Amino acid sequence: MQIIADLLNTIPAINSAAMSRAQRHVDGLFKPVGSLGKLEALAIQLAGMPGVNGIPHVGKKAVLVMCADHGVWEEGVAISPKEVTAIQAENMTRGTTGVCVLAAQAGANVHVIDVGIDTAEPIPGLINMRVARGSGNIASAPAMSRRQAEKLLLDVICYTRELAKNGVTLFGVGELGMANTTPAAAIVSTITGRDPEEVVGIGANLPTDKLANKIDVVRRAITLNQPNPQDGVDVLAKVGGFDLVGIAGVMLGAASCGLPVLLDGFLSYAAALAACQMSPAIKPYLIPSHLSAEKGARIALSHLGLEPYLNRDMRIGEGIVQALAMSIIEAACAIYNNMGELAASNIVLPGNTTSDLNS
């Protein structure tokens, strides 16, 4: 779809001059150089994003949760009933799920988006972007057509950009869909070139005696559909799912506005791999909240070249951990904007020179 290609070509590059200025500012704060480690690096990374105009800050925060069912559920790759997708989506509208609780704690609005839930009627309270009642069973057919994938990508990109116009400066992604770690593993396997056995995990507590079947399903899906690992849309359409497409759309939309996106868990890594195939320029805008305990997590993040901020043995979706990590973003902004400067107190520490502080 040409309109998507045109939009991706407008994704702004990170402002290296702004990052250099931010580096000098951070080095001149009341602390030894580098003593705040990755928090300093995060503040500098944020400063380079054109959407924040050189000064790391957080305005409105939005978590976009993509909800969809998956035809591959029929292959016995998940233990939860498929109906749980719809039930939990309804619970999100009541604010009682994990992502809603932690997003509220972080002061973020949760946007629950139906991109493919398998119900006869749309669920009240959800944002309706439904493409179909669940994706195709990737073990026997493509997840969707390329046209469907491109249309959903564009819809989500436009929705994300509209939120940015209305003051959102920090985006987070989440997902909901029974069996969705299976297509996620298929995407990771396809793009990284790793064998399914290396990336397929137990997801939402799949019994280990069923893991061999899940690995076989992923292998069959890739063999049957032959996704092109260089074409992110092709991978999403053939072995992905509507929720994964939606997550990729948020990343592309936020990056096109020069704004950061907090990744959540394994599903978001898979979507990021596909999105980066569409536009490598989005990578500096992606902030990994944590290292998921799902088996293929390290492989996916390593391929992306991203180092997570948290590692607490969590293996859960919804956007729960990225909501928790929003406080890290705010902490990076706080130290940048509110800490005092050494130069103002005539303090010179090893590694901080007068010329550095006055640059």
Curated annotation (Swiss-Prot):
<dbReference type="InterPro" id="IPR003200">
    <property type="entry name" value="Nict_dMeBzImd_PRibTrfase"/>
</dbReference>
<comment type="similarity">
    <text>Belongs to the CobT family.</text>
</comment>
<comment type="subunit">
    <text>Homodimer.</text>
</comment>
<keyword id="KW-0328">Glycosyltransferase</keyword>
<keyword id="KW-0808">Transferase</keyword>
<comment type="pathway">
    <text>Nucleoside biosynthesis; alpha-ribazole biosynthesis; alpha-ribazole from 5,6-dimethylbenzimidazole: step 1/2.</text>
</comment>
<dbReference type="Pfam" id="PF02277">
    <property type="entry name" value="DBI_PRT"/>
</dbReference>
<comment type="function">
    <text>Catalyzes the synthesis of alpha-ribazole-5'-phosphate from nicotinate mononucleotide (NAMN) and 5,6-dimethylbenzimidazole (DMB).</text>
</comment>
<protein>
    <recommendedName>
        <fullName>Nicotinate-nucleotide--dimethylbenzimidazole phosphoribosyltransferase</fullName>
        <ecNumber>2.4.2.21</ecNumber>
    </recommendedName>
</protein>
<dbReference type="InterPro" id="IPR036087">
    <property type="entry name" value="Nict_dMeBzImd_PRibTrfase_sf"/>
</dbReference>
<keyword id="KW-0169">Cobalamin biosynthesis</keyword>
<dbReference type="InterPro" id="IPR023195">
    <property type="entry name" value="Nict_dMeBzImd_PRibTrfase_N"/>
</dbReference>
<dbReference type="GO" id="GO:0008939">
    <property type="term" value="F:nicotinate-nucleotide-dimethylbenzimidazole phosphoribosyltransferase activity"/>
</dbReference>
<feature type="active site" description="Proton acceptor">
    <location>
        <position position="318"/>
    </location>
</feature>
<dbReference type="InterPro" id="IPR017846">
    <property type="entry name" value="Nict_dMeBzImd_PRibTrfase_bact"/>
</dbReference>
<dbReference type="GO" id="GO:0009236">
    <property type="term" value="P:cobalamin biosynthetic process"/>
</dbReference>
